[in-house]
A protein has these predicted regions:
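Intrinsically disordered, low-complexity linker/loop segments enriched in Gly/Pro
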Residues: 80-124
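C-terminal, well-structured catalytic/ligand-binding subdomain of enzymes
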Residues: 3-95, 125, 130-276
Length: 276
């Protein structure tokens, strides 16, 4: 059901995400494309014969990830002429901005509307947006309003319950889908915030992974690098350069091969076959 976070430690800014799906045949793709003066990395899945970007980070360090949301009781989707499609505005945001503060300018007082969840029927969607300057928030669809939950204590975590419904509660009092993963991640990050880096991020993803976790990615935006593990095999990792548009085997492999993103993309199944 997915877990994500942004951590602003003393030395590093780190983003992390687990992508979970019970569709074991879901086709996944990594992309790095250029737009104006930016390189943009996307993690995408094939939904209804079209690749949908679940996550992205640009070379200015802006991170966006959309994952499953368990609706609050009594929730009704917005329906007004002031609505704007979530995925449309996220696409514009990652192409045009580098700071979270710029998102509100693009949104321009409009109400964001998420489509139905394509992977988990009965669930909705919510999104984490973070930048390398220490600013991050979670945006959720309210009743004729956008619900924003901002960073606290130098980090922010998103699982599958509505963050906006628990803003006044202590972290260990949340409940709902993914609450156990949220509490687990919160405890570990709090205890390791002063030395939080790539290894600590993967430890969070390992502790919050599930049987249906298909992909785990850690981003270091100040270096424009990403690290990826597949299917909870955290002994094997690849390193991605968003600037160079390359991926190379790292931990757990006999060789340290580096390859270019062909036509800007690599299919996850091909990546596995390349390094068998």
């Amino acid at each position: 059901m997915c877990t994500s976070f942004a951590v602003y430690g003393q030395e590093k800014t780190i983003y992390g995400m687990n992508f979970d799906s019970d569709d074991i045949n879901l086709k996944l793709k990594l992309k790095i494309n250029s737009y104006n003066d930016k390189n943009i990395f996307n993690f995408s899945g094939l939904i209804d014969n079209k690749y949908l970007d679940f996550a992205g980070v640009n070379s200015d360090g802006l991170f966006i990830y959309t994952q499953a949301l368990e609706y609050s009781a009594g929730f009704k989707p917005s329906c007004s002429e002031n609505d704007v499609s979530a995925f449309d505005i996220f696409d514009e945001t990652i192409k045009e901005t580098k700071k979270v503060s710029e998102f509100s300018e693009i949104l321009n007082n409009r109400i964001i509307v998420f489509p139905s969840n394509p992977l988990f029927p009965g669930f909705g969607l919510h999104t984490i947006i973070a930048d390398k300057y220490g600013d991050a928030f979670i945006i959720e669809e309210g009743i004729d309003e956008n619900i924003i939950s901002k960073t606290m204590n130098d980090f922010i975590i998103m699982t599958n319950f509505p963050n906006g419904a628990f803003q006044e509660l202590n972290y260990d009092k949340v409940y709902g889908c993914g609450a156990d993963r949220y509490i687990c991640a919160h405890k570990y990050i709090s205890n390791n915030i002063n030395s939080f880096g790539i290894n600590e991020a993967f430890e969070v993803l390992k502790r919050t992974s599930q049987e249906i976790t298909m992909c785990s990615i850690v981003f270091e935006p100040l270096k424009n690098e990403a690290y990826i593990s597949l299917k909870t095999d955290f002994e094997k990792k690849w390193k991605i350069s968003i600037v160079e548009k390359t991926i190379q085997s790292l931990d757990g492999f006999l060789s340290n091969n580096k390859i270019q993103f062909t036509n800007g993309e690599i299919f996850v199944k091909d990546l596995i076959n390349l390094y068998k």
